[in-house]
């Protein structure tokens, strides 16, 4: 699931 890290990163204020 490629969008999951982006979503989590967005919530945390960064993107992996």
Swiss-Prot record:
GO cellular component, one term: extracellular region
Statement: the UniProt record of this protein carries the keyword Secreted: yes
Tissue expression from the record: Expressed by the venom gland.
Keywords assigned: Secreted
Compartment(s): Secreted
Protein name: Cryptide Pep-14
Gene source species: Tityus obscurus (Amazonian scorpion)
